[in-house]
Amino acid sequence: MRITQILLCLVIVALSSSSHVWSDQIFPAHLVGTFSRNNREPKYKIEFLPEDSPFHPGDNLESMVMLDKHGNRFLCYLPKEEKATSGWTSSQQNISTVMMETQQLVKLKTPDELLQPLSEKCLFRQEGWWSYEFCHQKYVRQLHVEDENKIVQEFFLGTFDPEATAAFNQTVSDASTDASQRYHSHVYTNGTTCDLTGSPREVEVRFVCAETRAMVTSITELSTCKYALTVQCPTLCKHPLFQLEKPVSHTIHCNAIPVEEDATRNKEEQAVDESPKMIADS
């Protein structure tokens, strides 16, 4: 669907649901809302302006006469559709920009460097019978503790494996994933032998960006004796790949058409057989 058609639908929805009582308003413009399909796509705000304080458009806008359900006429200005200069989507261009900025910042710390504060102490998570201990770049342990911190049962889910980690991160890319869902992984292998498979336990530790404190947020068994442990880390948010792309924001301005101008415009439209789009009253 072309962007003009999408914007037209947004304006129609706004006109259908909005009442325009200019004399009762404190502010000259009436902001209906912000529209966007996701946090990467451009955001569009729609503002309705009264006759005595109209919007003055530039040359880069398209205009269209619209009717609301009360028959009031508005001249709305929509951003012109940009001609595609490449086969890339706006999301891909955003990602490409982030990658280029990342490469240009020579002193930018890598995700592993940003994770170093986790080495200061081990993190724990309690889930029912079991407790889980994560010691950064050392090991992940599953244990059951009773009175006075007495360990009565324990399994090592894995010890840090730098070679397996490097190989894993070479084959997995999060560039196409929304920044809020990206994570950086470390692989821990050679854990306690699994009774069901006869192989050592393994765990993938997934580090995610979170502004709150560092903590283990979840532990999942992906398959028999193979686990995924999620750790949130505030310092990881400093890396561009884990920062949310800020979408471009546009405002669609709709000027109330004065009665005199409305009559003139009606005659012109009838002469060229151009009628405004009517919005059905629901």
UniProtKB/Swiss-Prot annotation:
Deletion: any effect?
No visible phenotype under normal growth conditions, but mutant plants have enhanced sensitivity to salt stress.
Q: Which cysteines form disulfides?
A: 122-135, 194-225, 209-237
| Subcellular localization | Endoplasmic reticulum
The protein's recorded glycosylation sites are 94, 169, 190
Record PROSITE patterns: MRH (PS51914)
> Basic and acidic residues bias: where?
262-276
Name the keywords, alphabetized.
Answer: Disulfide bond, Endoplasmic reticulum, Glycoprotein, Lectin, Signal
- Family per UniProt? Belongs to the OS-9 family.
Protein function: Lectin which functions in endoplasmic reticulum (ER) quality control and ER-associated degradation (ERAD). May bind terminally misfolded non-glycosylated proteins as well as improperly folded glycoproteins, retain them in the ER, and possibly transfer them to the ubiquitination machinery and promote their degradation. Targets the misfolded LRR receptor kinase BRI1 and the misfolded receptor-like kinase EFR.
Name this protein carries in UniProt? Protein OS-9 homolog
Q: Which organism is it from?
A: Arabidopsis thaliana
